[in-house]
From Swiss-Prot:
Residues involved in ATP binding: 606-614, 634
Topological region Extracellular: 33-532
Leader sequence segment: 1-31
Gene: PDGFRB
Protein name as it appears in the record: Platelet-derived growth factor receptor beta
Family per record: Belongs to the protein kinase superfamily. Tyr protein kinase family. CSF-1/PDGF receptor subfamily.
Cytoplasmic side: 554-1103
Record has Membrane as a keyword: yes
Sites bearing Phosphotyrosine, chain numbering: 562, 579, 581, 686, 716, 740, 751, 763, 771, 775, 778, 857, 934, 970, 1009, 1021
Activity regulation behaviour: Present in an inactive conformation in the absence of bound ligand. Binding of PDGFB and/or PDGFD leads to dimerization and activation by autophosphorylation on tyrosine residues.
Keywords assigned by UniProt, alphabetized: ATP-binding, Cell membrane, Chemotaxis, Cytoplasmic vesicle, Developmental protein, Disulfide bond, Glycoprotein, Immunoglobulin domain, Kinase, Lysosome, Membrane, Nucleotide-binding, Phosphoprotein, Receptor, Repeat, Signal, Transferase, Transmembrane, Transmembrane helix, Tyrosine-protein kinase, Ubl conjugation
Chain residue ranges for the region called Disordered: 1017-1103
InterPro entries documented for this protein: Ig-like_dom, Ig-like_dom_sf, Ig-like_fold, Ig_I-set, Ig_sub, Ig_sub2, Immunoglobulin_dom, Kinase-like_dom_sf
Assembly and oligomerization: Interacts with homodimeric PDGFB and PDGFD, and with heterodimers formed by PDGFA and PDGFB. May also interact with homodimeric PDGFC. Monomer in the absence of bound ligand. Interaction with homodimeric PDGFB, heterodimers formed by PDGFA and PDGFB or homodimeric PDGFD, leads to receptor dimerization, where both PDGFRA homodimers and heterodimers with PDGFRB are observed. Interacts with SH2B2/APS. Interacts directly (tyrosine phosphorylated) with SHB. Interacts (tyrosine phosphorylated) with PIK3R1 and RASA1. Interacts (tyrosine phosphorylated) with CBL.
Length: 1103
């Protein structure tokens, strides 16, 4: 098809042969190709339309990216051919090379191709996109490559960086091609700044391919020099030691000969350098300097060139202009950049209102000038959190001895509008006036609007604008004032309403470029009916009542409820992350635990909490060997709710289910009929472990101090060490002085009557317990004396062995609970009680603790949790297992070896505590703990609970740290306890037929279901119990001293051992004083206040 007005195009077969002939015969061939508008570069505005025309003596065509875009070809009357390319709605992607060539020539002829480069600055596109394969650049040692990070705006300053390195590389940059040079095997990123935003290019990866060739690099000390300065160019060759240098430079043909200097770089192998030095350069020395290197062995050649410019004098040239007015938003940071070229390096000074600016000490103004290339500089003014006072006239001046340049602009600080005042008044004229005043920059616009049929203007409904109202209804007056000292405009507008018949909402709205602000006021008639006032008052009272009820309901829901912390596991999922707990209310209750209320005489309150209290009492008939026994009774307060009564009954059933153990506060009996529920447990006269450690800390520290003396001075039996005075009772501020536990007393009643008792009520003043006095002065009464063969030593001195012994006993008790699949959930030193002879027992006295005032418990919803003692899985996933108790045991160890310290003393109980636990933070080694003890703590604090040691393993680990005497004494006391007529042992025997065949507490196998026949209608209940195993997995039976802790294989009533409930009194003569034993010679311990390491020969306490 032939285009009208054009000649038929030659056929493609002979087109390449006819084209030179046409060029020679054409009368305009000498003119060649002509591009309109001429190049070589054009900068187009984004979204504009542009027309390119190419003409020549033969058919021409436009090409881009090896393709021919859509274009229009024509032939004029004088025989000239032309092609028109229309670029419509240009974007940054239109940036690139455009070629005009003769159709079918493919650029074969020298004059048959002409190039034009077009830039389309696009603020959203810093760098032109590249194909993925262009991101990987392969080179040889002699190959110069180009990193093609091309920009859409030639005015942008582009720097090349190694990835994650802020220092730019001194590589020449071409806006049309990118960075060209020799690169190392690294990852490179191009950077530029568009406005206030720094833009990074894609990462380019350079890989070198090793070839046996020479590699040449050329660099100059300066590529720009002034006339009369020296030119020094270095040509460096790597990879070969026998090369020939040939230089080509501008004035070589005119007869100026320069002898280069060649030397070896001895500190770098295979590096040869040739230096071309031209002193006193002249203008004619400007041009290209070429270093040609050759070697004759493999006939390898390589050459590199560099351009050097000689200027007559120095210069300073600004690149690009800033708008005359620059804007900054109030309290936002603003950076202003000026780009310029200069040689030699200039001095840069910034001025504000003709006053020199310096770096502000407060960091509010930052000035910096950086050299991005040899002669290009960027000077930046940064205003941090712009203030109104920083508006003004700014000037940047760059100068040196030869030239100077400066750029000035005005900075305007835009301030968001704000309505400062909206008020109404009632002038004497009868009108109602509304006045609105506001400020902002740039000048705000004020509009008035009303909602005539509503009391206020809803945001979703457009109000009625004022301004078109008639003169009879309203009158508007607006004044605008500029305040130079505040650099902002103030608008004051007055609206006069001539008649208001009903309440009317009037809105004043201010807006400018940064947003808008509004306020509303309700205009009421002069004579507002009394009915409206009454209705408003009633509505306000109703709203206040509803709000008060909501607050009361929320407070009632947040009130903590008592719940038993101990849980019995019924089954475990296959992955070990889901546990099903036994419902305690479904456990049977054996009536053999019942004790008639008339056999119990209540005394004073030992501890009182938010839900209940613990009372000292005397029980009659609990033991065959003792007519009376001092006990502790747990009960609820009279204000207890039904759910709390149910929780106390659950605690009773769990305690009766567990059975007796030496290191657990054992159940002795209960009163559940004919009155409130009483749980009767063992009485521990020395209170909780925290308070015990605080009271006896001075004896421990004194003992450690004495151990630094020669061993001959250290005699420790049942008496105090030499030089240590008898400890007098010292009451520390905020601590109890040997009390049952550290609890607040919220009642002033010292003696608790038996409530709701059938028959006669007994009130008795129980003999004042000596636990309130220093226990070293305590002398047991005749009924309380115990057989010395089974009593534990009652030395008042606290030793390192005692600390390890406490830990060992708690581990034994927790091993027993774990064998019963019981999870404690609140294991802490405050829930460990101290009995005669430093025997410890695990308990849970949350009932009698005011947890709402106890700083150890943190409110979480409607409950209080001991977060500092809880394992991570319990805090974050509410997962409680025996292994989460292991974590708490590690915290308890830290308490013991800090002598009663509070865990995590350096962490506040807020988000910082939770974050520290998630990051794996653990407490440091206590001062009094040995490395072995701290290693046990760290094992207990493993992040994954599956790899924490079980309590059976913890017993073995702690057992190794104790002397043989201690372990034998403990085993003897445990066996005596199990052979005694202790009420807990006797009732467990009566409750379980076939008593000698009870399971070992070390049996931690999976849960089976064994039928138990209770006395009162519970025959259908199946209670979960561990199944028996013939042997223990951890080793021979006799290897664990805790084996006998709950084994009831020998039954007799020869003696009774209970916590503070001694045996039947026996008549025995007063012991004669024994001669003082000879002191043993022991190595002197290290001078460490912690007294680490148990020393059996120096410790005769406990056990």
């Amino acid at each position: 098809m032939q285009v009208p007005g054009t000649m038929p195009a030659p056929v493609l077969k002979g087109q390449a042969l006819w084209l030179p002939l046409l060029l020679m015969l054409s009368p305009q061939a000498s003119g060649g190709l002509v591009i309109t508008p001429p190049g070589p570069e054009l900068v187009l505005n984004i979204s504009s339309t542009f027309v390119l025309t190419c003409s020549g003596p033969a058919p021409v065509v436009w090409e881009r990216l090896s393709q021919e875009p859509l274009q229009k070809m024509a032939r004029t009357q004088d025989g000239t051919f032309s092609s028109t390319l229309t670029l419509t709605n240009v974007t940054g992607l239109d940036t690139g090379e455009y070629f005009c060539t003769y159709k079918g020539s493919h650029g074969l002829e020298p004059d048959g191709r002409k190039r034009l480069y077009i830039f389309v600055p696009d603020p959203t596109m810093g760098f032109l996109p590249v194909d993925p394969e262009e991101l990987f650049i392969f080179l040889t040692e002699i190959t110069e490559i180009t990193i093609p990070c091309r920009v859409t705006d030639p005015r942008l300053v582009v720097t090349l960086h190694e990835k994650k390195v802020d220092i730019p590389l001194p590589i020449p940059y071409d806006h049309q091609r990118g960075f060209s040079g020799t690169f190392e095997d690294k990852t490179y990123v191009c950077k530029t700044t568009i406005g206030d935003k720094e833009v990074d290019s894609e990462a380019y990866y350079v890989y070198s391919l090793q070839v046996s060739s020479i590699n040449v690099s050329v660099n100059a000390v300066q590529t720009v020099v002034r006339q009369g300065e020296n030119i020094t160019i270095m040509c460096i060759v790597t990879g070969n030691e026998v090369v020939n240098f040939e230089w080509t430079y501008p004035r070589m043909e005119s007869g100026r000969l320069v002898e280069p200097v060649t030397d070896f770089l001895f500190n770098v192998p295979s590096h040869i350098r040739s230096i071309l030095h031209i002193p006193s350069a002249e203008l004619g020395d400007s041009g290209t300097y070429i270093c040609n290197v050759s070697e004759s062995v493999n006939d390898h050649r390589d050459e590199k060139s560099i351009n050097v410019t000689v200027v007559e004098s120095g210069y300073v040239r600004l690149l690009g202009e800033l708008d005359a007015v620059q804007f900054a938003e109030l309290h936002r940071s603003r950076a202003l950049q000026v780009v310029f070229e200069a040689y030699p390096p200039p001095t840069v000074v910034w001025f504000k209102d003709n006053r020199t600016l310096g770096d502000s000490s407060a960091g509010e103004i930052a000035l910096s000038t950086r050299n991005v290339s040899e002669t290009r500089y960027v000077s930046e003014l940064t205003l941090v959190r712009v203030k109104v006072a920083e508006a003004g006239y700014y000037t940047m001046r760059a100068f040196h001895e030869d030239a100077e340049a400066q750029l000035s602009f005005q900075l305007q600080v835009n301030v968001p509008v704000r309505v400062l005042e909206l008020s109404e008044s009632h002038p004497a004229s009868g009108e109602q006036t509304v006045r609105c005043r506001g400020r902002g920059m740039p000048q705000p616009h004020l509009t008035w609007s009303t909602c005539s049929d509503l009391k206020r203007c809803p945001r979703e409904l457009p109000p009625t604008p004022l301004g078109n109202s008639s003169e009879e209804e309203s009158q508007l007056e607006t004044n605008v004032t500029y305040w130079p000292e505040d650099q902002e405009f103030e608008v004051v507008s007055t609206l006069r309403l001539r008649r208001v018949d009903q309440p009317l909402s009037v809105r004043c709205t201010l807006h400018n470029l940064l947003g808008h602000d509004m306020q509303e006021v309700t205009v009421v008639p002069h004579s507002l009916p009394f009915k409206v006032v009454v209705i408003s008052a009633i509505l306000a009272l109703v709203v206040l009542t509803i709000i008060s009820l909501i607050i009361l309901i929320m407070l009632w829901q947040k009130k903590p409820r008592y719940e038993i912390r101990w849980k019995v596991i019924e089954s475990v999922s296959s992955d070990g992350h889901e546990y099903i707990y036994v419902d305690p209310m479904q456990l049977p209750y054996d009536s053999t635990w019942e004790l008639p209320r008339d056999q119990l005489v209540l005394g004073r309150t030992l501890g009182s909490g938010a839900f209940g209290q613990v009372v000292e009492a005397t029980a009659h008939g609990l033991s065959h060997s003792q007519a009376t026994m001092k006990v502790a009774v747990k009960m609820l307060k009279s204000t207890a709710r039904s759910s709390e009564k149910q929780a106390l009954m659950s605690e009773l059933k769990i305690m009766s289910h567990l059975g007796p153990h030496l290191n657990v506060v054992n159940l002795l009996g209960a009163c559940t009929k004919g009155g409130p529920i009483y749980i009767i447990t063992e009485y521990c006269r020395y209170g909780d472990l925290v308070d015990y450690l605080h009271r006896n800390k001075h004896t421990f520290l004194q003992l450690c101090s004495d151990k630094r003396r020669p061993p001959s001075a250290e005699l420790y039996s049942n008496a105090l060490p030499a030089g240590l005075p008898l400890p007098s009772h010292v009451s520390l501020p905020g601590e109890s002085d040997g009390g049952y536990m550290d609890m607040s007393k919220d009642e002033s009643v010292d003696y608790v009557p038996m409530l709701d008792m059938k028959g006669g009520v007994k009130y008795a003043d129980i003999e004042s317990s000596s636990y309130m006095a220093p226990y070293d002065n305590y002398v047991p009464t005749a009924p309380e004396r115990t057989c010395r063969a089974t009593l534990i030593n009652e030395s008042p001195v606290l030793s390192y062995t005692d600390l390890v012994g406490f830990s060992y006993q708690v581990a034994n008790g927790m091993e027993f609970l774990a064998s019963k699949n019981c999870v404690h959930r609140d294991l802490a030193a405050r829930n460990v009680l101290i009995c005669e002879g430093k025997l410890v027992k695990i308990c849970d006295f949350g009932l009698a603790r005011d947890i709402m005032r106890d700083s150890n418990y943190i409110s979480k919803g409607s409950t209080f949790l001991p977060l500092k003692w809880m394992a991570p899985e319990s805090i974050f996933n509410s997962l409680y297992t025996t292994l989460s108790d292991v974590w708490s045991f590690g915290i308890l160890l830290w308490e013991i070896f800090t002598l009663g310290g509070t865990p995590y003393p350096e962490l506040p109980m807020n988000e910082q505590f939770y974050n520290a636990i998630k990051r794996g933070y653990r407490m440091a080694q206590p001062a009094h703990a040995s490395d072995e003890i701290y290693e046990i703590m760290q094992k207990c604090w493993e992040e994954k609970f599956e790899i924490r040691p079980p309590f059976s393993q913890l017993v073995l680990l702690l057992e190794r740290l104790l002397g043989e005497g201690y372990k034998k004494k403990y085993q003897q006391v445990d066996e005596e306890f199990l052979r005694s007529d202790h009420p807990a042992v006797l009732r467990s025997q009566a409750r379980l037929p076939g008593f000698p065949g009870l399971r070992s507490p070390l049996d931690t196998s999976s849960v089976l279901y064994t039928a138990v026949q209770p006395n009162e209608g519970d025959n259908d209940y199946i209670i979960p119990l561990p199944d028996p195993k013939p042997e223990v997995a951890d080793g021979p039976l006799e290897s664990s001293p805790s084996l006998a802790s709950s084994t009831l294989n020998e039954v007799n009533t020869s003696s009774t051992i209970s916590c503070d409930s001694p045996l039947e009194p026996q008549e025995e003569p007063e012991p004669e004083p024994e001669p003082q034993p000879e002191p043993q010679v022991v190595p002197e311990p290290p001078l460490d206040s912690s007294c680490p390491g148990p020393r059996a020969e120096a410790e005769d306490s406990f056990l």
